Amino acid sequence: MGRTFIHASKIKHAARKRKHHSNFRTLIKLLNNDAYKIESSKPLKNGKLFKYWKNRRRLFSKIDSASIYMTDELWFSVTPERIACFLANFVKACMPNAERILDVFCGGGGNTIQFAMQFPYVYGVDYSIEHIYCTAKNAQSYGVDDRIWLKRGSWKKLVSKQKLSKIKYDCVFGSPPWGGPEYLRNDVYDLEQHLKPMGITKMLKSFLKLSPNVIMFLPRNSDLNQLSRATRKVLGPFAKCKVLYVKENGYMKGIFCMWGECFFNYEPASTENSRRESSEKEELSSENEELSKRKKHESTTTTKDNTVDIYDVNG
């Protein structure tokens, strides 16, 4: 999709200007057909997505009042709005002077939009032109398309060809494909074998090429031993990863894994978000397979190789 990012507010103009490229021709068709627009009151034809449709307002709170666009895949891959909002506020608290955020697998724009609520320059990358289209349309519905720039491309190719390195990013975020709902079939999620488009070690290394501050949203059953090994292999034997277990409506949704000094050296009690969000403390078992010993107040605990917190985004 060209060498540069496309401003989300000018995506139609950019598509027409570059219509000789196949991806832009596809984009023009999507725009002309108003494709993938969700009718909030009408259940989806795909019955397998019904449980996600029931929770549609958790994905996008404006789904009843504004135009929201999602492909079938995005129904189970978009970060719920409260969780995306929590993360954006958390990053803002840790990096109050940050300006530029890169969202590597932007999907339908769940995280991209919330980052744009907090930061003036947000860049979204995705392999799918349909996802780029959905992000742009959803950003328009939330009124933040003037803060978002988008680019279609394979993450492997973009990194290997250094097509993103001209911009200095304050933080790189990514919610890489987990492999669909099937990720919960195993008790422990293999971060080297099942994470796409590459294992956790290569993924971390590729993100760190663009910024020393990195965040990934990973499955709640991720193998934390693999996470520790990847951290030490890429950053050295004494490096640690900050892990935030995130709950919504009493259910664990996933973990935010963070690398960068700013995520360790911050004062949570001083932020509006932290006053609003309640959190609990839980210890990881030696096998990292179960959480226990819950407490009501926010605290931080360290395992051998990671720092672990748990937050409930509902307060």
UniProtKB/Swiss-Prot annotation:
<dbReference type="GO" id="GO:0005730">
    <property type="term" value="C:nucleolus"/>
</dbReference>
<dbReference type="GO" id="GO:0008173">
    <property type="term" value="F:RNA methyltransferase activity"/>
</dbReference>
<dbReference type="GO" id="GO:0051321">
    <property type="term" value="P:meiotic cell cycle"/>
</dbReference>
<dbReference type="InterPro" id="IPR019012">
    <property type="entry name" value="RNA_cap_Gua-N2-MeTrfase"/>
</dbReference>
<keyword id="KW-0539">Nucleus</keyword>
<dbReference type="GO" id="GO:0008033">
    <property type="term" value="P:tRNA processing"/>
</dbReference>
<feature type="binding site">
    <location>
        <position position="126"/>
    </location>
    <ligand>
        <name>S-adenosyl-L-methionine</name>
    </ligand>
</feature>
<dbReference type="GO" id="GO:0036261">
    <property type="term" value="P:7-methylguanosine cap hypermethylation"/>
</dbReference>
<feature type="region of interest" description="Required for correct nucleolar localization">
    <location>
        <begin position="1"/>
        <end position="58"/>
    </location>
</feature>
<dbReference type="GO" id="GO:0071164">
    <property type="term" value="F:RNA cap trimethylguanosine synthase activity"/>
</dbReference>
<feature type="compositionally biased region" description="Basic and acidic residues">
    <location>
        <begin position="273"/>
        <end position="284"/>
    </location>
</feature>
<comment type="similarity">
    <text>Belongs to the methyltransferase superfamily. Trimethylguanosine synthase family.</text>
</comment>
<dbReference type="Pfam" id="PF09445">
    <property type="entry name" value="Methyltransf_15"/>
</dbReference>
<feature type="region of interest" description="Disordered">
    <location>
        <begin position="271"/>
        <end position="315"/>
    </location>
</feature>
<dbReference type="GO" id="GO:0017126">
    <property type="term" value="P:nucleologenesis"/>
</dbReference>
<dbReference type="GO" id="GO:0005634">
    <property type="term" value="C:nucleus"/>
</dbReference>
<dbReference type="InterPro" id="IPR029063">
    <property type="entry name" value="SAM-dependent_MTases_sf"/>
</dbReference>
<protein>
    <recommendedName>
        <fullName>Trimethylguanosine synthase</fullName>
        <ecNumber>2.1.1.-</ecNumber>
    </recommendedName>
</protein>
<dbReference type="GO" id="GO:0032210">
    <property type="term" value="P:regulation of telomere maintenance via telomerase"/>
</dbReference>
<comment type="function">
    <text>Catalyzes the two serial methylation steps for the conversion of the 7-monomethylguanosine (m(7)G) caps of snRNAs and snoRNAs to a 2,2,7-trimethylguanosine (m(2,2,7)G) cap structure. The enzyme is specific for guanine, and N7 methylation must precede N2 methylation. Hypermethylates the m3G cap on TLC1 telomerase which affects telomere silencing and telomere length regulation. Required for pre-mRNA splicing, pre-rRNA processing and small ribosomal subunit synthesis. Involved in nucleolar structural organization.</text>
</comment>
<keyword id="KW-0949">S-adenosyl-L-methionine</keyword>
<dbReference type="GO" id="GO:0001510">
    <property type="term" value="P:RNA methylation"/>
</dbReference>
<comment type="subunit">
    <text>Monomer. Interacts with the spliceosomal snRNP core component SMB1 and the snoRNP components CBF5 and NOP58.</text>
</comment>
<keyword id="KW-0808">Transferase</keyword>
<keyword id="KW-0489">Methyltransferase</keyword>
